[in-house]
Amino acid sequence: AKANFLTEIFDEKFIRVPTSGAFLGGQNYDRRHTMSQGQVMAFKGDIIPPDDWIYFNCECKFYKDFKFHLLFNESKVLDGWIDETLATANENDLNIIFMKFNNIGEYVAYQRREKFKVKNFISYSRGWNFTSHESFWNDYNISKIRDRSKGINL
């Protein structure tokens, strides 16, 4: 679903990774040194972006529930998703987490350093922000994601 959404927004083809990002994460990080750029992109994160989006790294999470009150203290779940995202990241990647929770809504977590423009957000620990899907998707952020992912304005 998120790959189709990104395909519509950016008018470029995105596809869901058929296997887990763990193929290149954690202790498997060094595998990327013997792989082509295209091979790395096929196993990094949960979405395979267009070929020229070499700095795009995202995770997609779909869960029944999320305990929002933990965002004000410490969310082991969100911390785990951040760790998972960063485990497959290369230097200068645009790291982003798309989340959907049953009967609650869709949300986006992103690194604060990216300076996306959103109306409302929660400043989470470890340099990440948490916002709603509706607040996140605007023309400025769409252009910024496209440019950053292609290496423009790094």
Residue ranges: model-predicted function:
Residues 1-154:
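Catalytic phosphate/metal-binding cores of nucleic-acid and nucleotide-processing enzymes, i.e., regions
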